[in-house]
Amino acid sequence: MRLPVLIIAAILGLGLFCGSALAKQLWLPTIDNPYCAITTYLLPDLPEQALSTMDNDHPIIVVSAMTMAQSSAYGRFLMAHECSHHTLGHVAVYKRELGHLGPQPFFYIAPQLRHMELDADCNAVRMLKIKNEPETIEVARQMMLQFGGKPTGAYYPTGIERAANIARCAAKY
Protein backbone atom coordinates (compact mmCIF):
# COMPACT_ATOMS: atom_id res chain seq x y z
CA MET A 1 0.00 0.00 0.00
CA ARG A 2 2.86 2.35 0.80
CA LEU A 3 4.84 1.54 -2.35
CA PRO A 4 2.78 3.82 -4.67
CA VAL A 5 3.28 6.72 -2.24
CA LEU A 6 7.03 6.12 -2.16
CA ILE A 7 7.18 5.92 -5.95
CA ILE A 8 5.29 9.20 -6.29
CA ALA A 9 7.52 10.88 -3.68
CA ALA A 10 10.63 9.60 -5.47
CA ILE A 11 9.39 10.93 -8.81
CA LEU A 12 8.55 14.29 -7.26
CA GLY A 13 11.91 14.42 -5.51
CA LEU A 14 13.74 13.56 -8.71
CA GLY A 15 11.75 16.25 -10.51
CA LEU A 16 12.78 18.77 -7.88
CA PHE A 17 16.47 18.14 -8.35
CA CYS A 18 16.57 17.21 -12.03
CA GLY A 19 13.45 18.60 -13.65
CA SER A 20 12.47 21.87 -15.19
CA ALA A 21 11.22 24.87 -13.27
CA LEU A 22 7.81 24.50 -14.95
CA ALA A 23 7.49 20.90 -13.76
CA LYS A 24 8.17 22.02 -10.20
CA GLN A 25 5.54 24.74 -10.44
CA LEU A 26 2.98 22.22 -11.63
CA TRP A 27 3.71 19.37 -9.22
CA LEU A 28 5.50 20.50 -6.08
CA PRO A 29 3.66 22.57 -3.50
CA THR A 30 5.34 25.70 -2.23
CA ILE A 31 4.94 27.41 1.10
CA ASP A 32 5.17 31.10 1.89
CA ASN A 33 8.53 31.80 3.49
CA PRO A 34 8.35 35.11 5.39
CA TYR A 35 12.10 35.16 6.12
CA CYS A 36 13.52 35.41 2.60
CA ALA A 37 12.41 35.67 -1.01
CA ILE A 38 13.56 32.16 -1.91
CA THR A 39 11.17 29.61 -3.37
CA THR A 40 10.39 27.14 -0.60
CA TYR A 41 8.98 23.73 -1.46
CA LEU A 42 7.01 21.51 0.89
CA LEU A 43 7.92 17.91 0.16
CA PRO A 44 6.33 14.79 1.68
CA ASP A 45 8.67 12.02 2.78
CA LEU A 46 11.76 14.23 2.74
CA PRO A 47 14.45 12.34 4.68
CA GLU A 48 15.77 15.62 6.13
CA GLN A 49 13.76 18.14 8.11
CA ALA A 50 14.81 20.86 5.67
CA LEU A 51 17.58 21.69 3.23
CA SER A 52 18.99 24.51 1.14
CA THR A 53 20.33 23.98 -2.35
CA MET A 54 20.51 25.42 -5.84
CA ASP A 55 18.37 24.43 -8.81
CA ASN A 56 19.63 25.65 -12.18
CA ASP A 57 21.58 28.38 -10.36
CA HIS A 58 18.46 29.50 -8.45
CA PRO A 59 18.39 29.18 -4.68
CA ILE A 60 15.67 26.93 -3.27
CA ILE A 61 14.66 25.62 0.13
CA VAL A 62 12.90 22.32 0.73
CA VAL A 63 11.03 21.66 3.98
CA SER A 64 9.54 18.38 5.15
CA ALA A 65 5.75 18.48 5.05
CA MET A 66 5.71 16.09 8.01
CA THR A 67 7.89 18.41 10.10
CA MET A 68 5.67 21.38 9.25
CA ALA A 69 2.55 19.41 10.19
CA GLN A 70 4.05 18.28 13.52
CA SER A 71 5.18 21.76 14.61
CA SER A 72 4.58 24.87 12.54
CA ALA A 73 6.73 26.90 14.97
CA TYR A 74 9.70 24.57 14.48
CA GLY A 75 8.99 24.61 10.74
CA ARG A 76 9.24 28.41 10.78
CA PHE A 77 12.60 28.18 12.55
CA LEU A 78 13.79 25.72 9.90
CA MET A 79 12.73 28.09 7.10
CA ALA A 80 14.62 30.97 8.75
CA HIS A 81 17.62 28.67 9.32
CA GLU A 82 17.67 27.54 5.67
CA CYS A 83 17.28 31.16 4.48
CA SER A 84 20.34 31.89 6.59
CA HIS A 85 22.39 29.26 4.79
CA HIS A 86 21.66 31.11 1.54
CA THR A 87 22.09 34.67 2.85
CA LEU A 88 25.31 33.84 4.71
CA GLY A 89 26.75 32.28 1.56
CA HIS A 90 26.99 28.73 2.91
CA VAL A 91 25.26 27.16 -0.09
CA ALA A 92 27.53 29.01 -2.53
CA VAL A 93 30.64 27.94 -0.56
CA TYR A 94 29.44 24.35 -0.51
CA LYS A 95 28.84 24.36 -4.26
CA ARG A 96 32.12 26.13 -5.03
CA GLU A 97 34.22 23.90 -2.75
CA LEU A 98 32.65 20.61 -3.84
CA GLY A 99 32.21 21.22 -7.54
CA HIS A 100 35.66 19.84 -8.34
CA LEU A 101 35.85 17.02 -5.80
CA GLY A 102 35.49 13.29 -6.14
CA PRO A 103 33.35 10.69 -4.38
CA GLN A 104 33.84 11.82 -0.75
CA PRO A 105 33.08 15.54 -0.83
CA PHE A 106 31.91 15.84 2.80
CA PHE A 107 35.44 14.97 3.95
CA TYR A 108 36.57 18.35 2.63
CA ILE A 109 33.92 20.53 4.23
CA ALA A 110 33.25 18.58 7.43
CA PRO A 111 35.31 21.02 9.53
CA GLN A 112 33.17 23.92 8.29
CA LEU A 113 29.76 22.28 8.79
CA ARG A 114 29.65 22.73 12.58
CA HIS A 115 30.42 26.44 12.28
CA MET A 116 27.93 26.91 9.42
CA GLU A 117 25.10 25.32 11.42
CA LEU A 118 25.74 27.49 14.47
CA ASP A 119 25.93 30.62 12.30
CA ALA A 120 22.69 29.72 10.51
CA ASP A 121 20.96 29.08 13.85
CA CYS A 122 22.10 32.46 15.18
CA ASN A 123 21.05 34.31 12.04
CA ALA A 124 17.68 32.53 12.14
CA VAL A 125 17.23 33.74 15.73
CA ARG A 126 18.02 37.29 14.59
CA MET A 127 15.39 37.06 11.83
CA LEU A 128 12.82 35.61 14.24
CA LYS A 129 13.51 38.42 16.74
CA ILE A 130 12.91 40.97 13.98
CA LYS A 131 9.59 39.24 13.18
CA ASN A 132 8.75 39.18 16.93
CA GLU A 133 8.56 35.38 17.17
CA PRO A 134 10.06 34.52 20.59
CA GLU A 135 7.94 31.37 20.85
CA THR A 136 9.44 30.05 17.61
CA ILE A 137 12.93 30.57 19.02
CA GLU A 138 12.03 28.71 22.22
CA VAL A 139 10.46 25.82 20.31
CA ALA A 140 13.66 25.49 18.26
CA ARG A 141 15.78 25.52 21.42
CA GLN A 142 13.60 22.82 22.97
CA MET A 143 13.76 20.70 19.79
CA MET A 144 17.56 20.89 19.84
CA LEU A 145 17.63 19.82 23.49
CA GLN A 146 15.84 16.62 22.47
CA PHE A 147 19.01 15.59 20.61
CA GLY A 148 20.95 15.88 23.87
CA GLY A 149 24.65 15.16 23.49
CA LYS A 150 24.19 13.59 20.05
CA PRO A 151 25.05 15.46 16.84
CA THR A 152 22.02 16.88 15.04
CA GLY A 153 23.42 15.68 11.71
CA ALA A 154 26.62 14.43 10.11
CA TYR A 155 29.47 16.61 11.41
CA TYR A 156 26.94 18.97 13.04
CA PRO A 157 27.04 20.29 16.60
CA THR A 158 25.22 18.39 19.34
CA GLY A 159 21.70 19.29 20.33
CA ILE A 160 23.01 20.76 23.60
CA GLU A 161 25.52 22.94 21.72
CA ARG A 162 22.86 24.20 19.34
CA ALA A 163 20.36 24.88 22.13
CA ALA A 164 22.99 26.88 24.05
CA ASN A 165 23.89 28.77 20.87
CA ILE A 166 20.23 29.60 20.21
CA ALA A 167 19.86 30.90 23.79
CA ARG A 168 23.06 33.01 23.46
CA CYS A 169 21.88 34.49 20.18
CA ALA A 170 18.41 35.20 21.58
CA ALA A 171 20.00 37.13 24.47
CA LYS A 172 22.30 38.98 22.05
CA TYR A 173 19.64 40.29 19.64
Model-derived segments and spans:
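Bacterial N-terminal signal peptides
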Residues: I7-F17
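Catalytic zinc-binding patch centered on the HExxH motif and its immediate surroundings
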Residues: P29-I60
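Short pre-active-site segment immediately N-terminal to the catalytic Zn-binding motif
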Residues: V63-F77
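Catalytic Zn2+-binding segment of zinc metalloproteases
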Residues: Y74, C83-G99, N132
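Active-site His/Glu-centered metal-binding helix of metallohydrolases
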Residues: M79-L88, D119, N123
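Post-HEXXH active-site segment of zinc metalloproteases
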Residues: H90-E117
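An active-site-proximal "capping" alpha-helix that borders the catalytic cofactor pocket
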Residues: L113-K131
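Long, well-structured alpha-helical subdomains associated
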Residues: I130-Y173
